[in-house]
């Protein structure tokens, strides 16, 4: 679950809607609850390494994968076991194929054309480029039941929130179904799921 506060006494919980805030707990109170001994410094991950982690997670969860062909030779196989990527996207998305084929990682239901999750890794590119791709897809494909995630480092969260709250994304409904994943969360997810297999 992801929770955002827009600074105007409105609380947003991804995939749950907006609520008025009745109470407040300060960051210092939350900071006191964190066990500092359990914090780990992570390396600075590259765009390709994060793509590799997300692809590996999808593969381990049983999804078919799409990663743009020009990114595939940059995947970091020292970080994860090799996985297979589809060479073509489903023809049912032909009218918007030029948008979809640029999405950094797509999980598809195995053996089908159903898009289950999409990830845009925004390492140095503008945050809104991924949001605009998602918005185009969301508007062009009615009844799409997919998850949309912008993935970046924590430093870029505020940039995500400023773009995420633009009227175009609120009016389309994308702001209700899109979330932000930090690199550290992707890495933790990757480590957890790899241990289970």
Regions found by a protein language model. Give the residues of each.
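Short, solvent-exposed linear motifs at loop/edge-of-secondary-structure regions
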Residues: 49-63, 108-127
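Active-site metal-binding core of divalent-cation-utilizing nuclease and nuclease-like domains
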Residues: 43, 59, 67-113, 194-195
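Domain-level recognition of nuclease-like catalytic cores that cleave nucleotide substrates
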Residues: 11-16, 154-197
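Nuclease catalytic cores
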Residues: 26-70, 95-96
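Internal, Lys/Arg-enriched amphipathic helical interaction segments that engage polyanionic partners
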Residues: 1-36
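A structural signal for short, well-ordered beta-strand segments and their strand-loop junctions
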Residues: 2-5, 65-68, 150
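Catalytic cores of nucleic-acid endonucleases
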Residues: 92, 98-103, 112-176
